[in-house]
């Protein structure tokens, strides 16, 4: 079906608002077309592969319907328009909605097999969320925000000192074992479909710190919640997982919340 659609005018299909990336999304009658720039089309392979891992572990994610990799397209399931951000905003029992999301997080952190085959029949395995990758993302704050503010840049060695501070934050992370990390575990990346929660935008998943996705969820700057509400969510998560060393988890949660919000 994708090859046929490519030969047609894409303007006939509804273009959806996507993320700030190299991808474009179009809605057909009952599916979503994902188009990628040719330089980044390997991202389509990653998206399909990660979705396969999630689906295999009974987590709702968009399944592949068809693909035309040569034309930079894949066709995936459509989970509708309602995401969990909309549902939470209209809910009178917000904590209950977050508890449902925490169950999904619990499921993905229990995944043990991180290997699969992409639709080109090549092996895929989740990569590690390395120190270099995390710091590179956090340094975006220095490259984008500070560079845009010339007055700040002129204040001596501020940029250099902030870089040292970021490095020291990373060095203070305590937890060593790694789990499946979605990396964009926000309520806007969760669709509410047929009374279930579906994860989307999972192509950047890695093996990393178990506190990372929780920090993404709780300290998401796009949705306002009180500090007491955030503390309640953290308590619910810790009680579910029964971490032996909660102080280590909270330490890493706080550090990763800072590091990941620096790149926004």
Residue spans for each PLM region:
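Active-site activation/catalytic loop segments of kinase-like enzymes and analogous catalytic loops
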Residues: 139-149, 210-244, 259-264
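An alpha-helical support segment within catalytic cores of ATP-dependent transferases
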Residues: 113, 124, 132-133, 137-180, ...
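A short beta-turn/loop motif at secondary-structure boundaries
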Residues: 16-20, 66-69, 256-257
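ATP-binding glycine-rich phosphate-binding loop
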Residues: 10-26
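Short, Lys/Arg-enriched N-terminal segments with co-localized hydrophobic residues
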Residues: 1-7
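Active-site acidic catalytic loop and adjacent metal/ATP-binding pocket
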Residues: 22-28, 33, 108-109, 166-214, ...
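All-alpha amphipathic helical-bundle segments outside canonical DNA-binding/catalytic cores
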Residues: 126-129, 246-257
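ATP-binding pocket architecture of kinase catalytic cores
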Residues: 26-136, 174
């Amino acid at each position: 079906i994708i090859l046929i659609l490519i030969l047609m005018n894409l303007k006939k299909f509804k273009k959806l608002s996507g993320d700030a990336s190299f991808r474009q999304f179009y809605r057909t009658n009952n599916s979503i077309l994902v188009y990628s720039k040719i330089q980044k089309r390997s991202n389509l392979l990653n998206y399909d592969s990660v979705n396969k891992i999630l689906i295999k572990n009974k987590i709702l994610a968009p399944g592949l319907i068809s693909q035309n990799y040569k034309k930079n397209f894949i066709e995936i399931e459509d989970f509708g328009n309602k995401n969990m951000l909309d549902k939470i905003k209209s809910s009178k029992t917000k904590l209950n909605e977050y508890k449902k999301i925490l169950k999904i997080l619990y499921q993905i952190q229990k995944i043990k097999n991180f290997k699969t085959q992409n639709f080109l029949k090549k092996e895929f395995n989740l990569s590690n969320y390395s120190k270099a990758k995390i710091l590179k993302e956090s340094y975006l704050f220095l490259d984008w925000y500070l560079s845009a503010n010339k007055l700040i840049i002129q204040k001596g060695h501020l940029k250099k000192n902030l870089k040292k501070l970021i490095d020291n934050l990373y060095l203070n992370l305590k937890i060593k074992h790694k789990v499946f990390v979605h990396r964009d575990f926000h309520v806007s990346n969760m669709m509410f479909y047929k009374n279930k929660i579906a994860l989307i935008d999972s192509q950047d998943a890695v093996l990393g710190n178990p506190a990372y996705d929780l920090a993404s969820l709780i300290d998401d700057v796009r949705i306002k919640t009180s500090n007491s509400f955030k503390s309640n969510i953290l308590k619910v998560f810790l009680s579910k997982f029964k971490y032996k060393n909660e102080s280590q988890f909270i330490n890493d949660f706080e550090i990763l919340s800072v590091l990941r919000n620096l790149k926004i």
